[in-house]
A protein has these predicted regions:
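The feature captures the beta-strand-to-loop junction immediately N-terminal to the Walker
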Residues: 51-53
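Non-catalytic connector elements of ABC transporters
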Residues: 253, 263-369
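ABC ATPase nucleotide-binding domain helices that frame the ATP-binding cleft
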Residues: 59-62, 158
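Helix-to-loop junction immediately C-terminal to a conserved catalytic motif
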Residues: 66
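ABC ATPase nucleotide-binding domains
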Residues: 47, 88-94, 98-245
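Conserved ABC transporter NBD signature motif
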Residues: 74-82
Length: 369
């Protein structure tokens, strides 16, 4: 079956050729299907993330774009030119790897200038371009340092500088921040986004971290079992997922099996809820509830619409928020995340408490498989 995608983003003019395009790309390793007729377009200047769990095919697709793998079937084009069998060194792309791949016997400057030496550019040209690339990643003063003298974040900046030193139109990144600690990773995400906006190079970024993809991307393509499940802007995927996999994988979500009871209503257990949009006539159906959109009502609240009851199983303090795990109807669990705000007078429920929950109709998302 051809794997088409639902794209909610507009990028580039309708007459503009995609910077990168995969057409009916399939990749097999023996009997294993790593990519199943994938179609993807990346417009010039976009940063698109390939997001998915381990084994979803995202790195395989990136390696096909890089030329490290050849598709079993299908075509890869850059700016309308067929690149399917073109070797990696002739594709004119910058690549940033997960583990930096820096040369330990070279200085920072020598590492960054290496792609230019391979291209046999003049010494003065290499020196000027190296300094410019290091300045771009804010490592001007590190040109003569050895790699072993650098922190993880500095090594990643050197890898970025090496990828951009020859000013490629296309940059590929394979989980470049996964080896960094959480605080540094989040800081580098902002730096990467700012760098992308300055360079305006088309960038394809592989990650399994949905928050990282939401932070960085103009568009996200969500993959699972070698297929693109949905492609669109971060807001499209978060607010309007097209299937249960995307709804569950992107964001913190409770998935509840429901039954259609009307054009805009569903039911689970003895609870009937109004929905924001027309419920598809399909089976199975799931109500995808974002943790931050499910509200715990005050005990004296008189709210009635889209209200249901449960019992707190666990209450977990997470610093800026409380996370509540609540049993509904004995066999269904939902999760609620509530921010801890200054001046908040509501008493936070604790384990064993009975609570009433409210899901506004505008926050309902109903999806199928």
């Amino acid at each position: 079956m051809q794997n088409t995608v639902d794209s909610g983003a507009e990028a580039g003019s309708s007459n503009e050729l995609p910077a990168v395009e995969a057409s009916n790309v399939r990749k097999t390793f023996g009997e294993f299907v790593a990519l199943d007729d994938v179609n993807l377009q990346v417009h010039p200047g976009q940063l698109i993330s390939l997001l998915g769990p381990s084994g979803s095919g995202k790195t395989t697709l990136l390696n096909i774009f890089a030329g490290f793998l050849r598709p079993t079937h299908g075509v890869v084009q850059f700016h309308g030119e067929d690149m399917t069998v073109v070797p990696p060194h002739q594709r004119g792309i910058g690549v940033v790897f997960q583990h930096y791949a820096l040369f330990p016997h070279m200085t920072v400057g020598q590492n960054v200038g290496y792609p230019l030496r391979v291209r046999r550019m003049s010494r003065d040209h290499i020196k000027d371009k190296t300094k410019k690339a290091l300045a771009t990643v804010q490592l001007d003063a590190f040109e003569d340092r050895r790699v072993e003298q650098l922190s993880g974040g500095q090594k990643q900046r050197v890898a970025l500088a090496r990828a951009i030193v020859f000013e490629p139109k296309i940059i590929l990144m394979d989980e470049p921040l996964s080896a960094l600690d959480k605080q540094l990773r989040e800081h580098m995400q902002i730096e990467l986004r700012e760098l992308h906006e300055r360079l305006n190079a088309t960038t394809i970024y592989v990650t399994h971290d949905q928050r990282e993809a939401l932070t960085l991307s103009d568009e996200i393509a969500v993959l699972n079992h070698g297929r693109i499940m949905q492609q669109g802007t971060p807001m499209d995927l978060y607010e309007d997922p097209k299937n249960s996999f995307v709804a569950d994988f992107v964001g913190e979500t409770s998935m509840i099996s429901v039954t259609r009871t009307g054009e805009k209503s569903v039911q689970f257990g003895g609870n009937e809820l109004e929905t924001r949009s027309v419920v598809p006539e399909a089976d199975p159906l799931y109500l995808a509830i974002r943790t931050e959109k499910l509200l715990v009502l005050d005990p004296d609240s008189e709210a009635t619409g889209n209200v249901f009851s449960g019992r707190v199983r666990h209450a977990v303090y997470q610093g800026e928020s409380m996370r509540l795990f609540i049993d509904i109807d004995g066999d269904t669990e939902v999760s609620v995340r509530r921010l801890c705000q200054a001046g908040d007078t509501m008493v936070m429920p604790k384990s064993g408490d009975n609570v009433r929950l409210h899901l506004p109709p505008e926050s309902t998302v109903v999806v199928t498989d």
